[in-house]
Amino acid sequence: MKEKKDIRILAFESSCDETSTAVVKNGSEIESLVVATQIKSHARFGGVVPEVASRHHIEVITQITREALEEAKVSWEDLDAIAVTHGPGLVGALLIGINAAKAASMATGLPLIGVDHIMGHISAAQLVEPVEYPALALQVSGGHTEIALLKDPTHFEIVGDTRDDAAGEAYDKIGRVLGVNYPAGKTIDQWAHQGKDTFGFPRAMIDEDNYDFSFSGLKSAFINTCHHADQIGEKLDKYDLAASFQAAVVDVLAEKTVRAIRQYQPKTFIMGGGVAANLGLRERMNKEIAALEKAPKVILPPLKLCGDNAAMIGAAAYNQYLAGNFADLTLDADPSMELPYAEDYK
């Protein structure tokens, strides 16, 4: 019997403030992963500056492409495809990765695969262990908070979404109020473990009969509480503030997700995105799902695969490769790209 050929994909990720390249074999094995972070450059601004992000991508993308190939000990001739995030994200940042991937595809003749950034985060799970379908994914990051149902690796639908702010965005905004440098999530998580939920911040939409989220009211309640305390000269405990904020976020995410698991009965539950690195959220999701009568397999990617990285793009691209979904050199950035919603799903 003929031995199955390994499929190696060189992937690019540049949708926001991380420039990353990776070589992924068979959609599940990371042969190399290089991430050039820009956190220090953006921290003084309190958030990502698109023009600064694009300039940094330009400066490092050639070098980290070379590093990814060297780390994987492969040449261009060993590759089977080139993959790149083409949305959603910052348009200028996306274009740097897209143009690099197009140039590589044109120079080598290798097929080009465009990858949805959100599907990349979800596909990070298959770098940990095989995903059994149907699967349910909670994607929670600075730009998105969504619950997605996956019927197979390339067919999916959104069953719940945020109506306003994403959870990660709320973390960063209240971090500014607390004087925490961008990105604020890790510090707030650490503080939350040292405090108590004493402020009773709102859990918006937690009892509504849907899987949507809203975090703008929570953010406003937090800011108003802090401003009122400042006006009357009251000093609030930062650990209790962090614990109260995080409890409100985690309560809603856990309640909605567990309810969706009960309805859709997935074989696997996946959590992805930068906020998936939050230890309080990981602990709560593991506890809630383990208590279910019919619990799915739970895959929580390691912390290094929760943030933006090219390995997850390579994993998602492998699924597209097997399905024959290739792009041509007209591939363009789609900064507002969205996964299909349930009512639009075919």
Curated annotation (Swiss-Prot):
UniProt-recorded Gene Ontology molecular function terms: iron ion binding; N(6)-L-threonylcarbamoyladenine synthase activity
Record Pfam families: TsaD
CDD domains listed in its UniProt record: ASKHA_NBD_TsaD_bac
GO cellular-component term (any): cytoplasm
Organism superkingdom: Bacteria
UniProt subcellular location: Cytoplasm
Reactions catalysed: L-threonylcarbamoyladenylate + adenosine(37) in tRNA = N(6)-L-threonylcarbamoyladenosine(37) in tRNA + AMP + H(+)
EC number: 2.3.1.234
Gene Ontology BP terms: tRNA threonylcarbamoyladenosine modification
Co-factor binding details: Binds 1 Fe(2+) ion per subunit.
UniProt keyword list: Acyltransferase, Cytoplasm, Iron, Metal-binding, Transferase, tRNA processing
Cofactor(s) needed by this chain: Fe(2+)
Amino-acid positions noted as binding Fe cation in the UniProt annotation, renumbered to this chain: 117, 121, 308
Binding site for substrate: 139-143, 172, 185, 189, 278
InterPro entries according to UniProt: ATPase_NBD, Gcp-like_dom, KAE1/TsaD, TsaD
PANTHER family, per database record: TRNA N6-ADENOSINE THREONYLCARBAMOYLTRANSFERASE, TRNA N6-ADENOSINE THREONYLCARBAMOYLTRANSFERASE, MITOCHONDRIAL
Function, as annotated: Required for the formation of a threonylcarbamoyl group on adenosine at position 37 (t(6)A37) in tRNAs that read codons beginning with adenine. Is involved in the transfer of the threonylcarbamoyl moiety of threonylcarbamoyl-AMP (TC-AMP) to the N6 group of A37, together with TsaE and TsaB. TsaD likely plays a direct catalytic role in this reaction.
Family: Belongs to the KAE1 / TsaD family.
Full protein name: tRNA N6-adenosine threonylcarbamoyltransferase
Lineage: Bacteria, Bacillati, Bacillota, Bacilli, Lactobacillales
Gene: tsaD
